[in-house]
Amino acid sequence: MTDKIRTLQGRVVSDKMEKSIVVAIERMVKHPVYGKFIKRTTKLHVHDENNECGIGDKVEIRECRPLSKTKSWTLVRVVEKAVL
């Protein structure tokens, strides 16, 4: 049995915490009745060991063991820095 680690990409929406960030993951979902595709957002708390992310950065994250009550994802890399 192979266990593939889940990885996702998203945008940083908050970096106010120490060693933690909040990442918004956007996905498209089809409406069950009308068939229109709707944009849905999920916010995940992510562990950022070196505090290297800022708001607006595009990041890659992966699932890990639970680090706190709400944090079970860790930062893999910063894909694209935000233009300020």
Swiss-Prot record:
One of the primary rRNA binding proteins, it binds specifically to the 5'-end of 16S ribosomal RNA. Pfam families: Ribosomal_S17. Part of the 30S ribosomal subunit. SUPFAM superfamilies: Nucleic acid-binding proteins. This is Small ribosomal subunit protein uS17. GO terms for molecular function: rRNA binding; structural constituent of ribosome. One of its GO terms (biological process) is translation. Keywords: Ribonucleoprotein, Ribosomal protein, RNA-binding, rRNA-binding. GO terms for cellular component: cytosolic small ribosomal subunit. Belongs to the universal ribosomal protein uS17 family.
